């Protein structure tokens, strides 16, 4: 269990103090080419990390201590997976929207996928720029199939480390037992997205000032261990278990002490994803 004091990524709460191989999988691997994403384009793709740590005074939002640890951990993890990582720090709402718009207009035709990581304060459906709220759906909409054609049919992953409300999870004791053909297909514009949230809807998301957020720590660890052999949803299930079992908040404020967290994955992916 973590035993250093933890914070939550909510705007309303002050701080309480080996080589990775990639490519399309052959039939010899037991993975059908028709059921898994083509990942042997010349480039794996972009990984955009928006790391919002310091917020305008008039927002009343606290500094997100520990987020730089998350950003560095993510950078190392996705660079090892051969992604082109771009970190953007302390962006306003307008800057976040402009960044997403500009990136969506790039030519992704030689890229296998796209990843965006959002590290900030949040509420349900909302991520915060340094000066206020941005609708998460608006940020992601730039990469819909009808807007970003060069990513159509390719996996688009959004990883969100932020609160989704103000509920606290006290936990409960439990027994210990038991070349593709997309040109001739019509697909939904919202297809091939995955949203990996650090917490369930309505709940706080925890972050440690020294080690970073629980979710990002677990995500990076599981990717480093399993990205070369497990499908993405299997990896994320292991992330869920690690966060749920191994982490518990420690706070001098009894209202925030001994709390739990469970990540939440929402997938519109249409194929299996192997890095």
Swiss-Prot record:
CDD domains hit by this protein: CASc
Compartment annotation: Cytoplasm
Sites of S-nitrosocysteine modification: 163
Major location category of this protein: cytoplasm
EC supergroup of this enzyme: hydrolase
Active site: residue positions: 121, 163
Classification via InterPro entries: Caspase-like_dom_sf, Caspase_cys_AS, Caspase_his_AS, Pept_C14, Pept_C14_caspase, Pept_C14_p10, Pept_C14_p20, Pept_C14A
One annotated GO biological process: neuron differentiation
PROSITE patterns tied to this protein: CASPASE_CYS, CASPASE_HIS, CASPASE_P10, CASPASE_P20
Disulphide-bonded residues: none
EC number: 3.4.22.56
Activity regulation description: Inhibited by BIRC6; following inhibition of BIRC6-caspase binding by DIABLO/SMAC, BIRC6 is subjected to caspase cleavage, leading to an increase in active caspases.
Keywords assigned by UniProt, alphabetized: Acetylation, Apoptosis, Cytoplasm, Hydrolase, Phosphoprotein, Protease, S-nitrosylation, Thiol protease, Ubl conjugation, Zymogen
Signal peptide: none
Modified residues annotated as Phosphoserine in this record: 26
Modified positions (N6-acetyllysine) in chain numbering: 11
GO molecular-function terms, A-Z: cysteine-type endopeptidase activity; endopeptidase activity; enzyme activator activity
Biological function: Involved in the activation cascade of caspases responsible for apoptosis execution. At the onset of apoptosis, it proteolytically cleaves poly(ADP-ribose) polymerase PARP1 at a '216-Asp-|-Gly-217' bond. Cleaves and activates sterol regulatory element binding proteins (SREBPs) between the basic helix-loop-helix leucine zipper domain and the membrane attachment domain. Cleaves and activates caspase-6, -7 and -9 (CASP6, CASP7 and CASP9, respectively). Cleaves and inactivates interleukin-18 (IL18). Triggers cell adhesion in sympathetic neurons through RET cleavage.
Family: Belongs to the peptidase C14A family.
Assembly mode: Heterotetramer that consists of two anti-parallel arranged heterodimers, each one formed by a 17 kDa (p17) and a 12 kDa (p12) subunit. Interacts with BIRC6/bruce.
Protein name per the record: Caspase-3
């Amino acid at each position: 269990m973590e035993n250093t004091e933890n914070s939550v990524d909510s705007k309303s709460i002050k701080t309480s103090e080996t080589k990775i191989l990639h490519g399309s999988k052959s039939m010899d691997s037991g993975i059908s080419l028709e059921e898994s994403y083509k990942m042997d384009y010349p480039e794996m793709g972009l990984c955009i990390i928006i790391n919002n740590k310091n917020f305008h005074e008039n927002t009343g939002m606290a500094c997100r201590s520990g987020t730089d640890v998350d950003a560095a951990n993510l950078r190392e993890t996705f660079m090892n997976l051969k992604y082109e990582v771009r970190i953007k720090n302390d962006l306003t709402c307008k800057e976040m929207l402009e960044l997403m718009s500009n990136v969506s207009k790039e030519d992704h035709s030689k890229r296998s996928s796209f990843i965006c990581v959002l590290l900030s304060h949040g509420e349900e459906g909302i991520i915060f720029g340094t000066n206020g709220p941005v609708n998460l759906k608006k940020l992601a909409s730039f990469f819909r199939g009808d807007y970003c054609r060069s990513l159509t049919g390719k996996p688009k992953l959004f990883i969100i480390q932020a609160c989704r409300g103000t509920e606290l999870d006290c936990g409960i004791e439990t027994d210990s037992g038991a070349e593709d053909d997309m040109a001739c297909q019509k697909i939904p514009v919202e297809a091939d997205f995955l949203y990996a949230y650090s917490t369930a809807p309505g709940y706080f998301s925890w972050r440690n000032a020294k080690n970073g957020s629980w979710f990002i720590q677990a995500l990076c660890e599981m990717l480093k261990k399993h990205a070369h052999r497990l499908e993405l949803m299997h990896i994320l299930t292991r992330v869920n278990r690690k966060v749920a079992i191994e982490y518990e908040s420690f706070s001098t404020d009894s209202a925030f002490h001994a709390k739990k967290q469970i990540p939440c994955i929402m997938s519109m992916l249409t194929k299996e994803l192997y890095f």
